[in-house]
Amino acid sequence: MAKNKDDEESYCGGGGYWDMVEDLEEEICFDAQEVIPNLYIGSISAATCTTSLKEHKITHILSISTNPPKIKEFTTLCINIEDESQKDISSYFQQCHGFIENGRKLGGILVHCSAGVSRSASVVISYLMSVFFKPFWYCMQYLRNIRPCIQPNTGFINQLINYEATILKNQNVISTTTTTTTTTTITKKKLISNDCNNDDNSSGGSGGGMES
């Protein structure tokens, strides 16, 4: 049996064995899943797997943590908040959404907290709600299908439910505005069409048109 690393390298035909082991360890530590294109959610361990982050073309890391890892070579944002029901995580939604959107455009982004269960899940759910205009429970279930362990704490859930009301209200405003704009456009087209018909009727039969 191999007694040390050198013996194992000789036994396995070179250093490729240890490269394989390191790659496997890296893959195991990358505790993250892709939610939608270029957006990942995971635990703090995923944020330290530099090789895996680069392989997934991740350029931005959003840490929802009071003790974020020190990460180089990536664009980072840290939201210093504890996983406690009374903490106001919703006040950070807009800032996080902007950072996520920018990260997705420039490459990819990982959103993480400590275990990838409560804080990061709350932020990702809020982002899905704002982008797709979907209710909280829909986005929660969608994310849980991808990462089964997620479970925002009770306080965060209440904040997300309140945020849902804002999202749906904004959707109604956009829908109303779009409907009004469409109606106005159709009305204008009808008026123009009627004007053209009136002009044709008033000049019809004169035979004064130019011919090529």
From Swiss-Prot:
Keyword Hydrolase: yes
Species this protein is from: Dictyostelium discoideum
Active site: C113
Alphabetized PANTHER family for the sequence: DUAL SPECIFICITY PROTEIN PHOSPHATASE, DUAL SPECIFICITY PROTEIN PHOSPHATASE DDB_G0269404-RELATED
Enzyme Commission designation: 3.1.3.16, 3.1.3.48
Keyword field contains Hydrolase: yes
CDD domains referenced in this protein's UniProt entry, alphabetically: DSP
Gene3D superfamilies referenced in this protein's UniProt entry, alphabetically: Protein tyrosine phosphatase superfamily
Similarity comment: Belongs to the protein-tyrosine phosphatase family. Non-receptor class dual specificity subfamily.
Protein name, as recorded: Probable dual specificity protein phosphatase DDB_G0269404
Domain Tyrosine-protein phosphatase per the UniProt entry, residue ranges: 30-169
